[in-house]
Amino acid sequence: VTCDLLSFEAKGFAANHSLCAAHCLAIGRRGGSCERGVCICRR
């Protein structure tokens, strides 16, 4: 959801990746990133 919700990039900074990482941290994971529009959390 977070990857498609705010998928924009400004000066090389992708806000959707930050939101995905924050989502993953909130559920107890070690961060994450977007891959093909899907938020993938690290284990």
From Swiss-Prot:
Q: Provide the leader sequence positions.
A: none
Q: Which GO terms describe its biological process?
A: defense response to bacterium; humoral immune response; innate immune response
Q: Enumerate the InterPro entries for this protein.
A: Defensin_insect (IPR017982), Defensin_invertebrate/fungal (IPR001542), Scorpion_toxin-like (IPR003614), Scorpion_toxin-like_sf (IPR036574)
Where this protein primarily resides, as one coarse class? secreted
- Detail the disulphide connectivity of this chain as listed in its UniProt entry: C3-C34, C20-C39, C24-C41
Query: Does the UniProt entry include the keyword Transmembrane helix?
Result: no
Gene Ontology cellular component terms for the protein in this record = extracellular space
The UniProt keyword set, sorted, is: Antibiotic, Antimicrobial, Defensin, Disulfide bond, Immunity, Innate immunity, Secreted
Q: Where in the cell is it found?
A: Secreted
Q: What up-regulates or down-regulates this gene? A: By bacterial infection.
> Of which family is this protein a member?
Belongs to the invertebrate defensin family. Type 1 subfamily.
Q: What does this protein do?
A: Antibacterial peptide. Affects Gram-negative bacteria including methicillin-resistant Staphylococcus aureus.
Protein name per its UniProtKB record: Defensin
- Which organism is this entry from? Trypoxylus dichotomus (Japanese rhinoceros beetle)
